[in-house]
Amino acid sequence: MTGSVRLRGLAVGTALSLCLTSPALADGMAKFEKLIKPQLPEGSLTYKSGKGLGDNGFVLEGVVVTPPPDTPSGKTEPIAIKKISVEDFDFTAFEKQTPPTYAKVRIEGIAVSDKPAEGIDLKEMAGIDKFNMDFQVDYRLEPERKTLTLNKLELDLSGLARLELSMILDGVSPDIAGDPDAAMNDATLRTATFVFEDRSILAKAVPAIAKMQGGDAAATLLIAKTMMAPLRTGQGPKAQAAFDAIESFVDDYKKPKGPLKVTLNPPDKVSATALSSAAGADDVIKALGLDVSYSGTVPHPAPKKQ
């Protein structure tokens, strides 16, 4: 909801992922090689081949990124990436050290090991071996209209799940990128859509969570519903329908009958600050014009007031 935070997050995330920092050269690849690559720590980014993609884009293939360690004595494993495609990027804004007003980037084949971080063993926890991940971001800020359009922010975990977010925010400008408080008050949501497509991750994650809790999957689902019950109590039909969809999706964790989709279409301008005063689920749903849909939804009895 905070326009500036989202804009800054998109800008920084894109820049760090692609190591972009400025330029005013004619070819996207030339901009990268002449002005960006020399600034990177030695050995932090390598690639087998690269080519320009118009004035503001480039493609790198056979990429290996070695992130800096968390501590001076620490060590990090290199991350293999099949391809990074920058179709369009606002080099001019970045050269001025201001948030890029547009970016369209696709990162394909990010290799994720079964031990992505210290103390985390996905294979032991959930039977998840190493897998590939794709990432896409496509956004544009119109400073004159103070409108941020996120056409797509997508994370695709091969064989596990896909998450996609799109939205339009009003009241967003580069000037408030460093002022979260102003963004909370000024940025308003026009519309948003979130899609969670499960392919197998819930079937792996639910039993894994149950194992960590010392129980079984049924007990874990019961705990989740028990925690959700107070949020449902005393709420109206629209709130109950939203909770029905969520609970049905979780009930079908072994094999969901389609994606879970959340859409937001506020009837009036709504900011994060305004939402903070919501008294319950009904208020939130009314303010956001929220709708949760799942093709396998079945009614669940609403908890009664005590």
Where do the protein language model's features map onto the residues?
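Bacterial N-terminal signal peptides that target proteins for export
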Residues: 1-12
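Glycine-rich, small/hydroxylated-residue low-complexity segments
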Residues: 20-306
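Bacterial N-terminal signal peptides
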Residues: 11-21
